Amino acid sequence: MQLLLIHSDYIEYETKKQTPVAEKIEESLKSGRLEEALTAFTAVESVDEANPEEAIKKAVSEIEKVAAQVKTNRIMLYPYAHLSSDLSSPKVAVQVLKGMEAALSSRYEVKRAPFGWYKAFTVSCKGHPLSELSRSIRPEGAAKAEVKTETCEKEEVVSEALKAEGTARSYWRILTPDGELHEVEGFDLTPYPKLQQFVNYEISKSRAVERAPPHVELMRRLELADYEPGSDSGNMRYYPKGRLVKSLLENYVLDVATEFGAMEVETPLMYDMNHPTLKKYLDRFPARQYSIESDKRHMFLRFAACFGQFLMNHDMTISYKNLPLRMIEMTRYSFRKEQRGELVGLRRLRAFTMPDMHTLCEDMDQAVNQFKEQYDLCISVLENVGIHINDYEVAIRFTRDFYEANKDLVVNMAKTVNKPVLVEMWDTRFFYFVLKFEFNFVDALAKASALSTVQIDVENAERYDISYVNADGKLERPTVLHCSPSGAIERCIYALLEKAAMETEEGKVPMLPVWLSPTQVRIVPISEKHIAFAEEVAKKLDFRVDVDDRDLSIGKKVREAGREWVPYVVVIGDKEMEESTINVTIREESGQDKPKKVQMTPEELNARIKEETSGKPYRKLPLAKYLSARPKFL
């Protein structure tokens, strides 16, 4: 049996549809709510069929232990098949769940959600260190090698740093641009609603998703990305338009990093879990890993490019003249075994694309100077992606000792963005870094996601035996910076879509930046006789241009271009053919009910788009030029 135990502010459910194996229930069981409860998500497995009574006994014992720890007398039993791929028969599952309900009811207020029904549910996790626990129950007789009943933690590769993160004591403050540190409770956040949401999100540590954020519908409607049911949760499929947007973002970040002085490298996706150096680093990185077996070796899938780049640094001959030394990799993919309840759309994934740059510095002084430069670099990268300073909140995290020695550095970070920022300070260093920042995007559901980040690492040069030759010919350890100039590429797309959704609510017209728009110009001929001239216009434009040659009304064609967020829509009719000009609807300058239309020449439109996309990478149209030749992906 698998148990996922969530200490909840509340849990509520409502049945929607029964499956072929649904138990018969009374009307009272079709919905339920329990507050201040321990929610036990339960998957009864095939091994439990050998001794159901023993499985009940051991599961009840585990639930009681946790209930005592979190001090609650309310328990919700919730059948949740997704916890296991080796389920028991429905008959045994119902038997065990009812047995657990009966055993617990004498000492607790218990509710049980019905088995075999599709249900809508909402759970609010309290977010303290004991609020999310998993247990794996194996009754006697379940395996030949077992002589007695054993209760164990569910097998999962969890780093020591991640465990420490759950118990680390944080001091939360608001840092204002004037350099003052304020207690969170006493600071008026009313003028800063997004910062207020971010503070609440960070301090509560509640990451569970109650409903899909707006970008999920948008990524599907725009045919960018979708869930892939044939893969693990958090692994997405990208349609041609989505692949184009991803590719452009990847190329842009790599271009910026190489101009900044980074060398692009490529490293393996998997590493040996028992490699002594890597094992130590795993325990200092707050993440859950995918693990696999290969030729009797226990391997893990990388969650960043650190492993490969640091092993490469170890083998290099480096002079002080080479410092600062920068390397970058666009990791397609990095993998993190994020908890299932946190996965949603492009916001939090298990497989993602991360630009990961590392900088070897001569000493802490050089590291601090590089940190300043990379902070500004990250602001510039997001600005050019279309995510501005007012679109995200800044978090700065450090040890108290580092802050006392580097106050000016920290204060200048708040001055640069010219707004209050959230500070997290630790008395003890739990991780490999002494300072880090993130730019956090707060979405329409008040959930935050980190984008750009830079960290000062004081451990890994020693751990990986990385050294350089100083001016005196002696070996020295460098100080290391970790930098992701944009954050995960998928999160950039998520942030752009969420931003557009929020702007729509404000009465604005949503759109992607022109350089990222899959179709930059759509030409809409009014009738078949205008198609030839439409083709002539298309040839004069050096950008991603398509032609809507379908046999539809002009109104429908224009509306569909709007639903696809096409930045420039060109309508071709008799007047345009006679005057050799084009009627252009400019999306960026339009209102929701007031399209901005301008008469111009193809050459003028070409010059306008060239100026808007200057300095950005370009790729050709990802689909057929003529809409009549395109398949539908959704």
Swiss-Prot record:
Residues 214-513 are annotated as: Catalytic. Its main location: cytoplasm. SUPFAM superfamilies: Class II aaRS ABD-related (SSF52954), Class II aaRS and biotin synthetases (SSF55681). Keywords: Aminoacyl-tRNA synthetase, ATP-binding, Cytoplasm, Ligase, Metal-binding, Nucleotide-binding, Protein biosynthesis, RNA-binding, tRNA-binding, Zinc. It catalyses: tRNA(Thr) + L-threonine + ATP = L-threonyl-tRNA(Thr) + AMP + diphosphate + H(+). One of its GO terms (cellular component) is cytoplasm. Zn(2+) binds at residues 306, 358, 482. One of its GO terms (molecular function) is threonine-tRNA ligase activity. It is found in: Cytoplasm. Its cofactor is Zn(2+). Binds 1 zinc ion per subunit. It is an enzyme of class 6 (ligase). It comes from the Archaea. Catalyzes the attachment of threonine to tRNA(Thr) in a two-step reaction: L-threonine is first activated by ATP to form Thr-AMP and then transferred to the acceptor end of tRNA(Thr). Edits incorrectly charged L-seryl-tRNA(Thr) probably via its editing domain (tested with total bovine tRNA). Activates L-serine, but does not detectably transfer it to tRNA (tested with total bovine tRNA). PANTHER family: THREONINE--TRNA LIGASE, CHLOROPLASTIC_MITOCHONDRIAL 2 (PTHR11451:SF44), THREONINE-TRNA LIGASE (PTHR11451). Homodimer. HAMAP family: Thr_tRNA_synth (MF_00184). Belongs to the class-II aminoacyl-tRNA synthetase family. This is Threonine--tRNA ligase. It comes from Methanosarcina mazei (strain ATCC BAA-159 / DSM 3647 / Goe1 / Go1 / JCM 11833 / OCM 88) (Methanosarcina frisia).
